[in-house]
Structures are given as C-alpha cells and as structure tokens.
Amino acid sequence: MELMFAEWEDGERFSFEDSDRFEEDSLCSFISEAESLCQNWRGWRKQSAGPNSPTGGGGGGGSGGTRMRDGLVIPLVELSAKQVAFHIPFEVVEKVYPPVPEQLQLRIAFWSFPENEEDIRLYSCLANGSADEFQRGDQLFRMRAVKDPLQIGFHLSATVVPPQMVPPKGAYNVAVMFDRCRVTSCSCTCGAGAKWCTHVVALCLFRIHNASAVCLRAPVSESLSRLQRDQLQKFAQYLISELPQQILPTAQRLLDELLSSQSTAINTVCGAPDPTAGPSASDQSTWYLDESTLTDNIKKTLHKFCGPSPVVFSDVNSMYLSSTEPPAAAEWACLLRPLRGREPEGVWNLLSIVREMFKRRDSNAAPLLEILTDQCLTYEQITGWWYSVRTSASHSSASGHTGRSNGQSEVAAHACASMCDEMVTLWRLAVLDPALSPQRRRELCTQLRQWQLKVIENVKRGQHKKTLERLFPGFRPAVEACYFNWEEAYPLPGVTYSGTDRKLALCWARALPSRPGASRSGGLEESRDRPRPLPTEPAVRPKEPGTKRKGLGEGVPSSQRGPRRLSAEGGDKALHKMGPGGGKAKALGGAGSGSKGSAGGGSKRRLSSEDSSLEPDLAEMSLDDSSLALGAEASTFGGFPESPPPCPLHGGSRGPSTFLPEPPDTYEEDGGVYFSEGPEPPTASVGPPGLLPGDVCTQDDLPSTDESGNGLPKTKEAAPAVGEEDDDYQAYYLNAQDGAGGEEEKAEGGAGEEHDLFAGLKPLEQESRMEVLFACAEALHAHGYSSEASRLTVELAQDLLANPPDLKVEPPPAKGKKNKVSTSRQTWVATNTLSKAAFLLTVLSERPEHHNLAFRVGMFALELQRPPASTKALEVKLAYQESEVAALLKKIPLGPSEMSTMRCRAEELREGTLCDYRPVLPLMLASFIFDVLCAPGSRPPSRNWNSETPGDEELGFEAAVAALGMKTTVSEAEHPLLCEGTRREKGDLALALMITYKDDQAKLKKILDKLLDRESQTHKPQTLSSFYSSSRPTTASQRSPSKHGGPSAPGALQPLTSGSAGPAQPGSVAGAGPGPTEGFTEKNVPESSPHSPCEGLPSEAALTPRPEGKVPSRLALGSRGGYNGRGWGSPGRPKKKHTGMASIDSSAPETTSDSSPTLSRRPLRGGWAPTSWGRGQDSDSISSSSSDSLGSSSSSGSRRASASGGARAKTVEVGRYKGRRPESHAPHVPNQPSEAAAHFYFELAKTVLIKAGGNSSTSIFTHPSSSGGHQGPHRNLHLCAFEIGLYALGLHNFVSPNWLSRTYSSHVSWITGQAMEIGSAALTILVECWDGHLTPPEVASLADRASRARDSNMVRAAAELALSCLPHAHALNPNEIQRALVQCKEQDNLMLEKACMAVEEAAKGGGVYPEVLFEVAHQWFWLYEQTAGGSSTAREGATSCSASGIRAGGEAGRGMPEGRGGPGTEPVTVAAAAVTAAATVVPVISVGSSLYPGPGLGHGHSPGLHPYTALQPHLPCSPQYLTHPAHPAHPMPHMPRPAVFPVPSSAYPQGVHPAFLGAQYPYSVTPPSLAATAVSFPVPSMAPITVHPYHTEPGLPLPTSVACELWGQGTVSSVHPASTFPAIQGASLPALTTQPSPLVSGGFPPPEEETHSQPVNPHSLHHLHAAYRVGMLALEMLGRRAHNDHPNNFSRSPPYTDDVKWLLGLAAKLGVNYVHQFCVGAAKGVLSPFVLQEIVMETLQRLSPAHAHNHLRAPAFHQLVQRCQQAYMQYIHHRLIHLTPADYDDFVNAIRSARSAFCLTPMGMMQFNDILQNLKRSKQTKELWQRVSLEMATFSP
C-alpha cells in the first residue's frame, strides 16, 4: 500500500540518511570506488524549499508568462494556448486548423516548455545517479553563466560560459528539444557521460525562471515558408559559407539527392523535417530518459550489493569483548532492516522515483521499472535470495546469531526479497492503471509471466529445491491484477480506459516501427499526463509505446495472454461463467492455468506456524503432484462450513470438497512497506488424504471461485444471504475436474511448465467487492487521481470500521496430538487490515474534512487485538506496520472530539479495562496517547491547542506507565520475536517517558518500577521477600497458557475484571503473581484471599486459561505475604539470596511451579549469602513459571522446611510440558527472564546513558566547553541507566548458570564504570542489591576503587559496599578482605565491628584463610584497646538490646520482614548439651529438641551479623564440643540461663565447633537426629562457669559468684534471638539459683596477672572475647588445612607463629579456662613441633609455675603435649628421608629440642629412646649417629 511512501511530502522517506544504517560499511571507501560514484540517486526530490531554491518553495512555480500576468485577467487565448501546448502535438494543431497564426504558434511554443524545476531535478538525478549535477547547474544559473538563449519553435539553445572560478573553462553549446511540457532530448558539447549535464540543467532552469528573457522565434519551417526564392537561395548559400567545414559535405550530399533523376526518398516524401517544429503526431511525448547511463549505474549498484561487503569494527572491543546478541534480537534486526533500512539504497530510490512517476502520470515509469526489473533478474544471486526467503518455512531464514558472518548474508537476502516484492507491487500498480488499455495489460501480463519463469529458471540452475516453485509468489500478485476490468469494476468517466480510446490505441500499436533486437517494450505504460482525457479527443495523446520500443506481446501465443474477458476483440470467449447466486467460477482453461486431472491446480505453498515445519501427520501422507495440496495447519482451523454444497461446476467426485479462506491481498498494498513477506495465506481446508511434505497449497495459487464461490453474490448487499462465513474471507472449494478444458490451449515449449506455475491464479476481479474496491482506490491514488481515490476511500474506511475483521483464534481440537493453535489466517487478516488502514490513513489525511475519519481508522488499527503472528517475518512486519500507522496518526491535527477519544482510551489503559485478551500489548496505542497528552512538543503546530485540559498530562503519564506494566500472555519459547518486539516497544515508550520526566524523580521511580518489573519475584534479585509468596496448590489440571485459548475460551481468554464474576472467585488472581497489572489497583483483589485462582473451582474452570494476573505481586502475596515491598532503591537492604539462586536456569521447562525452583541443585561452596531460611516458607524458590505468569499454576504447597534447614525437594509438576526439550534456551512460561531480555535491557541502559549525555569515556578527548554550563550526563537519567543496566545484569545471571565463576564481563565493567561515575548514589543502590547481580570479588574490587575517591560520601558508601561483601568472605581472597577491613576501619569503629563479625560468620562454613581470621582477631583487640578506658558510650546504640533480646542496631534493614512469626512452622532443634559426670551423678542439663511453641517474635536484623551472643564463647570447652542448631526460629521468652557443669575429660565426643552456633548456611545444618543427642563438655575441675552475656539485661537474675574476677561485672548473656532454649529437663538443678553453689571444688587460683585486674568496661570486654573467639576460629581453620608435606608444616617459625603466640597471651588475659581451650585448639591446628613446644612452655610460664604438674595433668594441656611429641616424631621421620650432610647440624638441634618435649610426660623418655633406636638402625651414615649420640650425652634438661 501507500504507507511506506506516505511521508513523501515531508521528503523524509527516500533520502537514505534517514533510514537505519546497521553497518556503515557502505561509507568505508565511498569516494574511491567507481561503483560508489553513482551515489544511489539521492536528492531526486527537493528536501525543503529553502532560500537555495530559485522558486523559494513553490516547487518550481509557473513560467515567466504567468508571473507577468499576476493580478491581471489572463486572456482566453493564453489559457487555450497553455492547454493545447500541454495536450496536443503541434503537428495535429497544424493539420486540423491550418494555417495557425504565427503569434499563436509562438504562444503554444512558449507554453510547451516544462514549468516545474522538480522534473528537471528528477531526470538529472536519474541520469547522473545523484543531484550533484543539478546543484551545479543551479549554481551556474545563479551565476548568470547562460548566454544568448534562443527558442526557435520547440528548440531551445544557448551558450553556457562557466565563470573563471569554476574549473572547466570555455563555452559550451547546449540544445534542448521539448514537446508538450516534456524535454524530449538534450545535447551539449561538454562531452559529459550523461546527457543531462550541468549545462543542460542550467539552461532549463534559466528557461523556467527567466522565460521572458529568452528570445522567442517561430519554427524554422514557418519562417522559411515566408521567404521568396531569392531569399531562400541566399539563406542556403550564407549558411554554407558561415560553416563551410561542418555543413559543406552534407549540403552537397543533399543537393545530389535532390537533383538526382532517380526517385530518391528526399524527392518522393512530401515536406521536409523541421527540428524546431516539434515531433510528429505519431511520436509519443516522453521525457528524455538516458537509458544506457542509467542501466550502467543500476548494474554497478546491484553488483556492489550482491558482492561481499566488508564488516568494519571500530575497535577490538566491539569484535571480541562485546556480547553477541541473542538469536531473537539478531532475527528481529535482520527482519526489520529490510522494512526500514531500504537496501540497496539506490534501487529503492529508483523504485520511489517510479512511484512518483506514476503519480505524475509520467509514461517513463514503466520503462524505468522494466530496466530495473531486467537488471535485477540478470543476477542469479538476487533471484536466489528472493526465492529462498519467500519459500523458507517461516519466511524468516534468519539464523540470528551474531550478524557478522552468516547474518550478513541473511540481512542482504531479506533486503533483496523486500526490494523484489516492491518491484512486483509497482508492476501491480502499473497494470491497475485505470487508463491502461486491455491490449497493453495483456502485453504486461505476458512480460510478467516470462519474468516469473526466468526467476524459476535461474533458481533451478542454483541449488534450491524444485518442489518449492509453486510456493514462490514472485510476480503472481501482479499477474493476478492483470485480470481486471475497470469498466466492470469501477468505471470512472474520463479516467478509466473506454472503448473510444481502444481503436486509436490499437492502430497506434500497429503503426509503431519496432527497434530490432529489442527485448523490452520501452513504452510499457502509455502516457497519462492529461488530468482527464475526454472521449472525443481522438488525436490528442497517443496511448501506446513510442517509436523506440516494441510491444511486449510479440511472439507470445494468445493462449498465454490470460483470460480474454479483458478484451473486447472478437474470438475471445469469456471464460467466466456465472455460478449460482451470481458468483463467477473460473474454469481453468484460458491463461494456461488448468491442470489435467488436478484437484484444482496443484499449486503448493507452505504455511507454517512460527518456525515450525509441516505438521508430522501431514508429512506421512503421499499424493501425486497434481493433486490439491492443502495448508499445513488446515485441520486446526475452525469456523468453516462443515460440508459446503458441491459446486455445480465441479462434480464433487473427489472426496470432500476443500474450501479455502480468501487469500490475503498481499499485493494490493500501494506502498512497499506492506508488500507481503510471504503473500501466501494459510489455507484452511479439510485436506484430501495424502500430502507431500513440501506440497502445501497456497491459496492465491489456487484457481478458485469468486469471493462468492460458495454461491455468494458479488454485491455487498446480497452478502448476508450465505451465512457460512461472517467476515470478508470467504471459503472456496475446488474440484479435480476443472482443468480438463485447458489442455488444448497450451502453447508449445515451456507452456506446460508455465501452466503449472500459474495454475491456481486468482484473478483480482474474483475477490470480494471490498477487496476490488481497495485495489481500485490504491490504483487511483498511485496514478494521481486523488479526488476519485479520496471519495472511494471514505466508503472503504466506513466499511472497515463497520465490519472489523474477525481475529479470534479458534480453540485447538480437544483430542489428538496437534493441540497447537494455528493463527495463520488471523495473521494474514491482521497484516492486511493494517495495510488497508495505513493506506486509508494516507489518503484520508490529505483532506481536512476527512481527518476525523482518518483518526478513527488509525485508532481502530492501533486497537486491533490480534493473536501472535504465525511466522517470524510477519511478526516483525506487523510491529512495523503498527509503528507506521502511529507515525501517520501523529500527523493528523486533533480536535475536541478526537481529544476526548484519546482521554477515554487513556482512562481505559490506566484502569486496565482496555482489553480482555492481549498476547500482543497495545503499546503503540499507549505511545501515541503519551505523545498526544504528555508531549505536546512532538505534535505538529496544526494541533488544536484549545482542546487540552489540565489533567491531560497526568492521565497520559499514568496510562503510559500502566502500559509499561502490562505483561504478555505468550512465552518466549513459542513466540520469541513477539516478546522481542514487545520489549522494544516498551523500551521506546519508557525512553520517551524518562526523557520527558527526567527532572521528576517521583515519576522516574514509577516508570522504572513498571519497566523493571520490580513487583515480580522472578526478575529481581532473589531476596528473602521472594520466598514469602502465599500461593497455594492449584488444580493439577491447569493447562499451560502458552497458546491463546483453551477449550472453554474459544478465541479469547475470559476477562477477569473486578466486576466480572466468571468461574473464578473474587481474589482468585491473588496467586497469579505479578501478572500483567494493566493498571489494576489494589482494590480489585481483596487482600484477605491468599488462595490461588483455581482453588475450589469446578474442573472446567481449571481448564480455562486464567486472564492476565491483574494484581501486583505484593497483592498476590495476600495478607500472609508479609512482603515489605522493598525495591532496589529502598533504604533497607533486602536479605541475601539463597545459595542456589546463583544457578537459576529458567530454561528448565518442567519446573513451572513455585514449589519447584528452577535451580541447578549443586551446593555452592559456602553459598554466596547466609540465607535466613526462617521456618520454611511456602514458596521458597523463584519459580520458573514465576508468579507473574498468566495462567500458570503457582502450585507450591505450604511445604515446611524440615529441621535440617529447609533443604528443598525438587518437585516437578508431572506432564506439564510433556515432550518439551529441557535444553531449550527460552522460557516456556510468559514473562520469564531470558537471554534476549537481558541483552535488550543492556542496550536500553546504554541508550538511556547516551540520552543522558553520554559517559565520560565517550568524551575523553573532547575539549571541555568554556561555557561553564552543565557538564556530564543528566544525573537522574544516568541513575536510570545504571538501574536498568543492573537489572539487565540480574536477568543475565538468571539465565547463566555459571555466572558466579566468571572472571570478566563487559556488562560488569560497564556497571562498575557507571557506579564510579555516578558516585555514592550508585554505590548505595549496589549495597542494597548487588547479590544476584555481581560476584563478591567484583563488589570488593569496586569498593576498593571507590574508596580512593575524593568525595567523602563516596568513600563512606564504598566502605558500606565493602562491608556488604564481607559476609561472602569465603569467596574473596585475603587481599580483598584486608582491604575491605581497612575501609571499614577508616570510617568508624562500629563499621569495623560489623566487618569483623561478617568475616567471622563467613568463616564458620570454611573457606576463609586463617591469616584473615587472625587479622580480624587483631582488629577486635585493637577495638578492645580503643575502648579499654571505658569510653564506649558512643557505641551504646549499636550494642544495646531491647528487653526481648532483639538487636536494635544498625542492621535492622537486613532482617526478615516483620510479622513472619506464626505457630505453623517446624520447631528448630538446638543441640543437647547434657553434662555428665564420670564417677558421680551430676544433674544433666538437656537442651532438648523441642522449643517453646509460643508465637514467634519478629526480629529486624540478620542473625548473620548479630554480635555473637550465642552460648559458645563463654563455655570453656574445646572447639568441637557443641552441636550447631538448625535454622533460627522463635526467640524464647526470657528465663534464667542454665549453668554448664564441668565434667572430667574422659569423654571427647566429636561435635561441631561452637562458632557454628550462629551460622545459617543450609549445608551446615545439623540433622534432627544429631540435634537431639547429648554432648558432654569435658572441663577441668574448677569453679562453675555460667553462661555469660556481654551486657546487662533487665529482669534476669544475676549470678553473683563467678570464677574469674574479670567476669565479675554482673552481666547476663543475651542469647541470640534465633538460638532459643527449651525448658530445663531435670528438676534438681541447684545452679539455677542466684547464688550458684560450686559442684566441684579444688580449682586453680586465677592467673596472677588477672587477680589484680581493674573492672573493665563491658563493651571492651566484648571486644576482647570476640578477639579470642575469632582467634580460636583461625586455629580451627589452620587445622582444616590439608595435611600435606608442605615445608612450612615442620618449619621452626611458620607464618602463623606470632599470631598463635599472641592468641595464647589473649587467652591468658581472659583466664585459665580460656588457656585450656586454647590448648585444645592449638593441638588441632598447629603442625610445627617447634611452635607447639613453645606454646607448651609459654603456657606453663603464664600459669603459675608452682603448679606445673597440676597443669600437665589437665586434659587439654596433656593433649597439647602429646600433639607436640607426635609432631616431633613426624618431623624426624620426614627429615630422615630428605637428609643431606649439610642439614646434620639442624637435625641434631631438632633432636635436642625433641628430647626436652618428651621429658614433659612420664612415658615420654621411653618413646624418645625408641626414636633414637630407630635412628640408629636407619640407613643414615655413622657420622650422623655419632653426632646425635654426642649431643645426647651432653644434654641436660
């Protein structure tokens, strides 16, 4: 249709600068290539009438003659001379009215020169390939280089003398001949290649603009006729003497012929030629077309297009490091590029010139189009591309990979197919020219058929499948249009060809001399330059080709010329007989379209659903080639008559009659935009048995009955008589016996094949009445009959609005394998409807009185509800068509009524009531509404400003934002390009919104909330709030909504608005998750209904696809959700993601419910974050079906996490996507994260950044502006770009299972670069939500970079960021951890405390280096030293606890959401700490396995970062003696803590280090069986130890007797809220009184240095304990290291020596119990015997040396000494293996040290002597033994 070229008047369409350039390779060597010199015919239309135009903007203006008479009455003679000059050859004038007065001759000659400089521009550009020559000629004209202009009759000559500064010097003689306002030939002496040179242009412009300055003379023959004989002789002799050299030979030859006695031609012909008198009456007046130059230029252009083009990368990054776009994005670009890009540009510009020539009724249109067509068909590459693209299964063969290698040729192939389709569209318009004679139409038909055969021939030489020939539409749309008669369809007096013209036209064609060897008719199109020729002008404008060209019809057998009804010549029988009811049924005879024995012409065409090949059951059938083959998806269609009556013409003998919907009018578009991607419609039919895989019938190939083939009358009024189909697309049925009559007419050679290829043509006149009228309207508009076209389009527009197309999708069959819904018919109807709407808009908007109707048509098109397209190419085309309609709508001025309509639509969008079924979202409509209501600056000035109201902008904004939040109902796996298109439209709308409101942060937040789908659980980083979905199990029979319909909802999903009861209960969408919110507000769903949609529904309701979820996800959570609504920008930090989140794999199709997380279930080392698993929430995973998926069942039972920590079972909904390949990379449920979505949002982020002003990296080398204005990007937009980029990274991680192990990502480097540029705001956002987006090393690196900034706020934010990654210390290297600790220390002590706690917490799962932990311990000690003086009031707020034991500190933002308590969760078991005595019965404290069942208390901080107030720090036990509790649950009501009783050291059960008490990692959970077992605490005999707190808690009994004075501050332990104690099982517990009585007496006196200690501030004491605790953890980590043969294992001073000794000092400072605990830890962690010995000796020194033997008997100390002795034995054996003489001294010293170690135990010396004996027997040399013996002899301990 005309849509592509609708914007001609603005000059926007055909300059290639405005079209999309995907690669700039065409510019690389533009000047140097010979092919590039053509410049692609740019500039053939003036872009805008500016001061450069001589006409100032009148488009050429009239001639000087008109100007002279401005304001005067123009005489009738002048007016008549002008009309005669335009329409009638001067020779005819002379013959009809002899003699013509000379003055009248001069006036006719004066008006015969063209008046419009645009014509000169066009033909100059055509000849030269660009407008450069025209511009130079215009320059010469302005410089007054045209001298001595002279017009003699119809001949204009002058001398052009370029000024001295113009390079070519000298004068040029220019001559131009013209006739009937057309330049018919031109010549110049400059010798330029093209005839339309600069000088010719200068002369023409001079004649147009300075007509009065041209000397005007009568034709030479007129002047000669007035001379006497003497004057004639003088004239001849003077002429010869003036130019003797040039003229004399010719003059002598003419004299010889004249004087010859024989009958020479010059003597026998009457009269003589006169070049100045104009052409003869037999000559056709056509503009001079420089064909040879034009043909050469077209060849060069096509050659360059077909050849390989270089791909130029501007930098290495773009080639190697940038991520390749995913297939969906690549395919979208590949398919959109030919629609928008227009390549090759030169050919498209020529095609646009052809279209403009049609409009001007320039008879060169057809010759130019013919040259183009011939040249294109000579390139087999072009025909091969065209053929392959149009016959490929989905009409989109785009491989869609990177667009570099294969993608490049794909783009070229699609561009080529688009170009060829546009050519066919133009040929269709050429044959539909209302003024075309039937004879000429038949000639064109023959030529078109030959071209079709030529394409097929070229293809056969290639490697294409022969079986697809009939699928290839090629020229058939144009051939079908040849069978059309204006006289019958839509006669227009004075416009359409009438019988009075016919006789002249035929005589004319016979009279034309033909050029030998011409293969092409030059005058394919008769001239139609008069506005309305009258039937009574016989000699006026000859209609047939001129003398230079030969008719197309020569040598073609008449049988191939098509049906004869087009001609009135005798002997041609009409082949169309009237069927019942007036329907014409075309017998397949004429036009060679019959097929012997065929079931209606065996034309085949593949119809495919998107990218699907033929259905398998069709492929199993077989059928001979001539039988009727039906569409692949025929059986899935619904709504056709079950058994149509047999047609009288067809006996109905061959099985069931087949009936077909009307073909789409793919070729009726007037603009190249709407050429059909694959003009084949789907055939809906009950196919005959058997079908070859390739033989799918295309509908427009089938010789079918008229639109009224079912017996429908052709007129619209009679249409209701048949009720089989209620839309325009009627059913056709064919039979096998139609082709019998056609065989006799077959012509020889090749005719059979042609007959085969053209079998099934459907003549245009057999279409429905409205289709025929559309074709008429397009032809009228294309050929310049705008008033007639306008009248017709009004009628068509009203009909379209009154009878909208039916786009409902039929439900799939209830049974059988093929339950895939076919949307082929609906897709074709939709694309044709949009084509028609665009055409109607174009025509109607030309007249102000039709603007309202145009507006209604445009809105109708934008509101069209269609299903997803059946092929990828059509999906892209439909989206492009919508955008074109929107662009056309924006040009229409809107009045009050239109504005009220816009407000109404905006309201509906905002409220979500616009549509009830939307796989395709109305985003174009929303964009248009936004433009109209919110962005008045984008509207044309013609808009009615008075129609605005104050609330318009807010309404438009809310409607646009609501549209952004809509969600489609189709999955990316089934319709990837629809999802891609939806994303792109959303991105464009969001971009417009963000730019418009870039200074309004509240609006920007709303935009981003909808665009980034922050209410959806699937798309945001997995935080704890995601686990608390209240969805419950739904019926298992819920069907997947992947296609748009279900058995109970034929065609459309049932709307579930707040008012419609339907089968679902109110609130039934509560579990649907954050589905398409469509503007629904919270009031639509009662919050109190947490059940899911299908709960309690009847079974049929369960099968009904649910409507799009109309509630935001926070409502979907119901009242139990506890969802705190925190988005990315919220101040509180959401909790971290669970460990499995890192490996989300959204492509696993079977896990589609909330209860079946799509996670790869490999436990990551330590996970990335401590997840507070709470008490096993309902939906503990992110669902692949995501709770925002429409119609997918969010079936997650309220499973409870078991006591083992909520390890989740992989529950799969069986049979949900049966047979689907799990390795598919696109999600099978709507609105899921996908690779394509991630790519899109990254690109959007970069676009927003560019719109914000670009980042600094793009302007490194630009000079800073001196204006001092705003520097750098717009901050708000920059932040938006950052958030979008972060969101994209999150999506990317969702679909990249191994993202946590990445080492480099260009996306991450972009994010970090922007964060550095934005500053603290971006870092704050990252602190909130980096987990799920970045890996801990990436965050640590960014924090480190940011800490070096000058801005203190940024440094502070960098420290916060560093702190936030320390809980993942196991994923960081020591340098990163050290740097993060330094950053926190630089801020303040509180942050350092948090950092230390975070590292310790991370270390409990392993993976943190001991060196790091020692560093943390030193930091704690540094804090102790800072606060030892008691000045800790500043940190009171951070460490104080509320009465309930809940930490009220700064981590409140990290906790679980409030109110998550409840009685329904599993009890958490705490380790049993039963204390037993060996010989005496001691009361046992059993910390049992059941907890208080009271209501839980919500706590607002993360247990992971709580100060370590759990039991273990104060229990003097060895690191492994406490088991670790499962996930924290309820804090208990406060009660006195039980004391822990010391027992002898006989039992050493291997438990878990107490440090694990605070951990929440799922993998470190104690199973229930272990949790209930009793564990002993072996403690040396000493005073009772109570569980000590860090600070006082009111309301608790305080123990007054403590073992160490250091602890005497009267504080009670604040038990970690998650670590609750059970009731004490066992009644006789005297220790629970306020004055505990010692159970064991005879303890050691306290260490000397502690007996006199001063009272210490409890805060500093807390730091001291923490330092000790972390040091002990480091010791444990040392022991966990692999016991390999590393040299450091037995080193005298390994790296950790100083740290271990420092820790011993710390233990001694705390008390003897801590020293004993240290000894146990050291025995396990230290490997070096030398260090162990030093520890033993130093410990003995620190304890009182007087009681050394008592100490040595202590179990912990004894264990340490034994470990030291074992280490010496291992060391000696190790050294003996690798000993060399050089090492003897060292070895002897080691033996000496070992002896002193063995002396510490009674049995030690025996062991030592055994070692010596072994040494003596070893293979070492005697010398070594002698030295050892000597040393032992002199040894004195």
Swiss-Prot record:
Biased composition (Gly residues): 55-65, 579-602, 1119-1130, 1447-1464
Main localization, broad class: cytoplasm
Low complexity compositional bias, start-end: 1174-1209
Subcellular location: Cytoplasm, Cytosol
Residues of the signal peptide: none
One MF term in the entry's GO annotations: zinc ion binding
Residues with PTM Phosphoserine: 36, 48, 53, 437, 567, 1153, 1156, 1160, 1267, 1836
Zinc finger boundaries on the chain: SWIM-type: 172-208
Single GO cellular component term: Cul3-RING ubiquitin ligase complex
UniProt region (Disordered), positions on chain: 45-65, 514-727, 803-823, 1016-1232, 1442-1464, 1635-1656
Pathway(s) the chain acts in: Protein modification; protein ubiquitination
Biased composition (Basic and acidic residues): 523-532, 566-575, 1210-1226
Protein's UniProt keywords contain Ribonucleoprotein: no
Keywords recorded for this protein, A-Z: Cytoplasm, Metal-binding, Phosphoprotein, Ubl conjugation pathway, Zinc, Zinc-finger
Modified residues (Phosphothreonine): 1139
Biological-process GO terms, alphabetical: positive regulation of miRNA catabolic process; proteasome-mediated ubiquitin-dependent protein catabolic process; protein quality control for misfolded or incompletely synthesized proteins; protein ubiquitination; target-directed miRNA degradation
InterPro entries from the UniProt entry: Znf_SWIM, ZSWIM4-8_C
Subunit (UniProt): Component of the SCF-like E3 ubiquitin-protein ligase complex which contains CUL3, RBX1, ELOB, ELOC and ZSWIM8.
Family (UniProt): Belongs to the ZSWIM8 family.
Name of protein: Zinc finger SWIM domain-containing protein 8
Organism field: Homo sapiens
Lineage: Eukaryota, Metazoa, Chordata, Craniata, Vertebrata
